[in-house]
Amino acid sequence: MSTQIDLVRRMVEAYNTGKTDDVAEFIHLEYLNPGALEHNPELRGPEAFAAAVTWLKYAFSEEAHLEEIEYEENGPWVRAKLALYGRHVGNLVGMPATGRRFSGEQIHLIRIVDGKIRDHRDWPDYLGTYRQLGEPWPTPEGWRP
């Protein structure tokens, strides 16, 4: 494996273990995943990534994990094909926990800058996950803070 793919594998390991004390070693100070802005719009860098790991475990249980399917690279970019497995145990954009298990494939595009992960976009299988959760409705309060 390449050094760039090794960095992405460390990211996946953090999601799987929940361990974030070393993320500054592989997450850039300017790290941004636009999909996480909904949860913490002001956070960037290793702190933003650590918050995303914490949220994943909160919403989908400590048993949530990403299975590595395939990695590809193109210049500074790494494409990771992963599958997420978990159980819905916490509030998910206004939808209370259902306790249901789910799985779904995802694509992650990650750019390495200065030897660290700086840019990160992911496209999970939202529709498939929503159906597996039983198509729950949000609470009356919804997802607005």
Swiss-Prot record:
Belongs to the polyketide cyclase DnrD family. The gene is dnrD. This is Aklanonic acid methyl ester cyclase DnrD. The lineage of its organism: Bacteria, Bacillati, Actinomycetota, Actinomycetes, Kitasatosporales. It catalyses: methyl aklanonate = aklaviketone. Optimum pH is 7. The enzyme is active between pH 5.0 and 9.0. Gene3D superfamilies: 3.10.450.50. Pfam families: SnoaL. In contrast to the analogous intramolecular aldol cyclization catalyzed by TcmI, the conversion catalyzed by DnrD occurs after anthraquinone formation and requires activation of a carboxylic acid group by esterification of aklanonic acid, the aklanonic acid methyl ester precursor. Disulfide bonds: none annotated. Its EC number is 5.5.1.23. One of its GO terms (biological process) is antibiotic biosynthetic process. Substrate binds at residue 106. One of its GO terms (molecular function) is intramolecular lyase activity. Pathway: Antibiotic biosynthesis; daunorubicin biosynthesis; Antibiotic biosynthesis; carminomycin biosynthesis; Antibiotic biosynthesis; rhodomycin biosynthesis; Antibiotic biosynthesis; aclacinomycin biosynthesis. Homotetramer. InterPro entries: Cyclase_SnoaL-like, NTF2-like_dom_sf. Involved in the biosynthesis of aklavinone which is an important precursor common to the formation of the clinically significant anthracyclines such as carminomycin, daunorubicin (daunomycin), rhodomycin, aclacinomycin T (aklavin) and aclacinomycin A (aclarubicin). These compounds are aromatic polyketide antibiotics that exhibit high cytotoxicity and are widely applied in the chemotherapy of a variety of cancers. Catalyzes the cyclization of aklanonic acid methyl ester to yield aklaviketone presumably via an intramolecular aldol condensation mechanism, although water is not eliminated. Keywords: Antibiotic biosynthesis, Isomerase.
